[in-house]
Amino acid sequence: MFVEIRKRGRKKKYYLVHSFRAGDKVKRISRYLGSDLSERELERLKPRAEKIILEQVKEKSIFEFELSKREIEEYKKIEKPLKVEHLQRLDWLRFTENFTYNTNAIEGSTVALDEAKDLIEHKEKPHGADEIETLGVANAVEYIRKTRSKLNISLIKKLHFLCFEKTKSFAGKLRNVEVVIRDRYGNIVHQGAPYNKVPKLLEKLTKWYAKHKIKYPPLLLAALVHNEFENIHPFQDGNGRVGRLLLNYVLLKHSYPPINIRFKDRQRYYRVLQIFEKKNDIKPTLRFLISQYKKQYR
């Protein structure tokens, strides 16, 4: 964001301006700060204006993501090198084990890959929340594999419930509190949408998907749904895991194989999410997902 000064007669009017991408177009949102302001007044007024602008960007985000035919063809070229493979029963078991381990590890689970395999394949009895959630995520993977449900709020809540029904009192319920994500130093790196706007934003997301699911290539669709879901952050906790399940739900609906985002690549994963949040640029996410596909199906 930057401060823009516009002269009106003898007055100087100050605006905080933010540029962001909607598809391949650059859009701007500005917020009036005042006229003839001192440096001190500017610094005092900027934080609130920045917060308001970011909330406006969150509400727009992919809902203004419209591509021309030429741009759609460009995104198809990005996906073209992918070799689409269909998984057999044993492949699905291996994917479920690896996905469950990695997606939980990204969120801080201490369950090792071998332990996840024992729990899922050998039906060992779980002990503690991490092991219980391992089985919960595995059940959710099985659900997205078999369900015929359309993408809607009920499906999103169902995935959260399957993951956390035995460990979280709010499993399957949209949050009624504000949430932020902090880094290890305590700095806020992401702020979820205001909780009173969450149902409306999820409804917009599902309608956006329904409108574009035939028009846009599958990986682009899945990436946009995943990233926008993470921006909204509709649950009190567990958004990362549900978001990655939604990513795979969309891929499977379009006959693409599921994708496993690896724990060891989590820092790059976080970076592409932040680029999308701040610049509305989906290309880094697409390149990241393609790199994960190549590691998985090489």
Which sequence ranges carry the predicted segments?
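FIC/Doc superfamily catalytic core
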Residues: 1-237, 241-298
